[in-house]
Each structure stands twice: as structure tokens, then as C-alpha cells.
């Protein structure tokens, strides 16, 4: 059963200077692992930050359809991260304990990420069962 679906696109140019931000600033939104990945190739950092930000926005939208509990965007950001699986496929890792109304359910998270030089897009689907 589909619990929620979210999609978000962002202009990558908004993230052009994020590689100059302090780790403390970046850690308000991203995990240490994500920051390291985004900064590893400076020429790609804007697209990498942008698509991970879009993933959070898409998850936030999908979550809003299946959860009556109000959680701020920044709180949600600290409990969600994009990781690359051993096969190199992006996955959204969620700390479900922050979402008590949903933590008892077996929820699958499907994510698709894409970006060009100028636009980053993410789609998230939440499914129960």
C-alpha cells in the first residue's frame, strides 16, 4: 500500500557556494557522511548537495501524506540521509524512531535521484508492507 509520494526539484545554482559553508552549518541538514561525499569532488558539490536537499524535500512531502504528527523540516533532515548502497544505488536511510506514528509499521522507502548541471530532482515513495 502506498503511504505517500513526494517529488522535488531545486535549482543547483542555489548550492554553488555551499562547499564554503562550515561543517556546523552543513550538519544542520546533512549527515557527516553526506558532507564528505559532496565535498569529495568540488566541481560536483553543488549538484550533490542539491540532489540530497531535494531528496529531503521529497521525503518531507511524502511523509506529510502519511503522518499526522508535525515535525519541522530541520528536525526531519537530521533523521534522514542519502547513502549509496554497495551497488552504488542511492538509498534513503530513515531513523523511524523520530516518527512515532509510523515507527511500528514496516515501511519501504523508494528513491530516485537525477540532476543536470542546473537542476536536481528527487522522487520518494513510501510503501507499507
Regions flagged by a language model, labelled:
Residues 1-129:
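Core catalytic alpha/beta fold that binds nucleotide/phospho-ligands
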Amino acid at each position: 500500500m502506498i503511504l505517500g509520494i513526494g517529488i522535488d526539484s531545486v535549482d543547483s545554482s542555489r548550492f554553488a557556494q555551499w562547499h564554503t559553508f562550515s561543517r556546523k552549518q552543513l550538519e544542520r541538514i546533512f549527515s557527516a557522511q553526506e558532507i564528505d561525499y559532496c565535498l569529495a569532488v568540488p566541481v560536483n558539490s553543488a549538484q550533490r548537495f542539491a540532489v540530497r536537499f531535494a531528496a529531503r524535500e521529497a521525503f518531507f512531502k511524502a511523509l506529510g501524506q502519511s503522518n499526522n504528527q508535525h515535525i519541522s523540516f530541520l528536525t526531519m533532515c537530521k533523521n534522514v540521509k542519502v547513502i549509496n548502497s554497495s551497488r552504488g544505488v542511492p538509498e534513503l536511510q530513515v531513523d523511524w524512531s523520530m516518527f512515532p506514528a509510523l515507527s511500528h509499521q514496516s515501511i519501504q522507502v523508494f528513491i530516485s535521484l537525477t540532476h543536470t548541471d542546473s537542476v536536481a530532482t528527487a522522487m520518494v515513495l513510501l510503501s507499507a508492507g
